[in-house]
Design a protein with these regions (language model features):
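N-terminal "arm"/small-domain region of PLP-dependent enzymes with the aminotransferase-like
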Residues: 2-36, 43, 47-117, 246, ...
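Active-site phosphate-binding strand-loop segment of PLP-dependent enzymes
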Residues: 94, 194, 198-250
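Short, small-residue-enriched loops and turns at beta-alpha junctions
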Residues: 97-98, 125-128, 180, 201-202, ...
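Conserved N-terminal alpha-helix of the aminotransferase class I/II PLP-enzyme fold
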Residues: 106-154
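Conserved PLP-anchoring active-site segment centered on the Schiff-base-forming lysine
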Residues: 161-180
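Short, structured coil segments at secondary-structure junctions
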Residues: 168, 188-190, 244, 274-275
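Conserved active-site segment immediately N-terminal to the catalytic lysine
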Residues: 245, 264-280
Length: 280
């Protein structure tokens, strides 16, 4: 009788255990997820430890940068968080005062009413408006160029330009003191990269001679170098470009609008308007 009961129980168990199989799978899955999460947490802790050590080293070196929070409009005099007094602003690029121009502020308000807030898309899909095209036309006309493309920042423009036009058959020849964004943009492209000594035309000519077998050569320079304020010798650069059949590209971030008799930047200032291939 006892043996029969045990056999009967085993028979019932064989019928029931498949019902618990999904539950077992769920428990096992949760266990694996918890183990994975535990591993991520441990790795995250290691990363935090490494980051904190790096930050401590930066602070110890005296190079840690706190974010400066401005509580007023951009202007020559601004107010910043943590100070009750106005301070002089020497580090913005608001050379012409356009950031706080009453006319531009009013135009921006009108644009909000007519076009709304934000584009809700990238330009390539459906984010280009008639205002973009009008401004691009006016900028191109102002500089005497064929066309213009707007970017959200000069850094983005420098990052996107070189890869779009040049490949391994080409050479980009850059002044060694060009802005970091220019250097990064050149690194992103596949062209062969060369640097000439700062504003050294003999060194530039040496590289132009060495690269004559390549498809395109593009000489790249700041118009006005933002750190030192010196002006690129554009006439000499353009003369060399003509001599060796090279292109000329300049960054006008720190000269357009106020350099030259009519504010058309270093090409006007140096008398080489019409000889520059690309202006950023």
């Amino acid at each position: 009788m006892e043996i029969k009961c045990h056999l009967h129980a085993l028979k019932d168990l064989n019928l029931i255990w498949p019902l618990f199989l999904p539950l077992f799978h769920c428990v096992y899955y949760l266990y694996l997820r918890m183990a994975e999460r535990l591993s991520i947490t441990k790795n995250g802790a290691k990363l935090n430890e490494a980051i904190n050590k790096t930050l401590d080293d930066i602070r110890a070196a005296g190079t840690f940068k706190e974010e400066r929070v401005i509580t007023s409009k951009q202007a020559a005099e601004i107010t910043v968080q943590g100070s009750d007094e106005k301070v002089l602003n020497f580090c913005a690029n608001n050379y012409l005062g356009l950031a706080n121009s009453p006319d531009l502020i009013e135009a921006a308000k009108e644009a909000l009413d007519s076009h709304g807030f934000g584009l809700a898309s990238v330009r390539f899909i459906c984010g280009t408006t008639d205002m973009h095209k009008e401004l691009e036309h006016l900028i191109a006309k102002f500089h005497g160029m064929e066309d213009c493309i707007l970017y959200s920042s000069c850094f983005d423009a420098n990052g996107g330009f070189f890869e779009a036009l040049f490949n391994a058959e080409d050479a980009v020849i850059s002044d060694q003191l060009n802005h970091a964004s220019i250097i990064d943009g050149i690194r992103l492209c596949k062209a062969q990269r060369y640097r000439y000594n700062h504003m050294d035309m003999e060194d530039l000519e040496r590289i132009l001679k060495e690269t004559q077998n390549l498809r395109y050569r593009c000489i790249v320079t700041d118009g006005v170098f933002s750190m030192d304020g010196d002006v690129a010798p554009l006439k000499e650069i353009c003369d060399l470009a003509d001599k060796y059949n090279a292109l000329v590209w300049i960054d006008e971030s720190h000269s357009a609008g106020f350099f030259g008799k009519t504010g058309r930047g270093t090409p006007e200032y140096c008398g080489v308007q019409g000889r520059i291939d690309f202006i950023n």
